[in-house]
């Protein structure tokens, strides 16, 4: 990681794949996920996501995270790399930065692009760790945008993410599982099957809370459009 790159918004990254740029809309505070979840007690649940897409070296992580979101239960949409890149480029046109000369875009723009394609009708936001635990347990998988730290590139044979080292850039990924006994989330990444445990990794609640508090965001679709059979 010795090459410094610039993505949209003027952010610098140490890895070309890190293309998530923060874009917060104050109006999002009116659309928290907690108001839609009646349950108060956390539960463990994993939303299966069969495809494992690989973004390659392109900073299209937002598009791939949203494609994985669509491919996961509860409303499965066939996901391909073409779909992921289509969402990514549409998000670039919808975000707050002019032009397409820079790589990267925001999770919010990805949500808008996914909605524009007719795949979902409504999305909400998880503001904090408890919101995310309840959202994954009851509502469905979430698309996260966080800082990616140097220590998160190497997850080891056990497939664990540890938030160590300096920030390397912003990354978007799917969180499709939560375990209450383990106090972990499951991350479904877009870096191929050789990363982590067949493309997935575990991250502890404490580390996740740190990421969320450090300009992190978690978008949760709550009204998905099921594809016609």
Predicted regions located by residue number:
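Catalytic-core signature of thiol
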Residues: 1-229
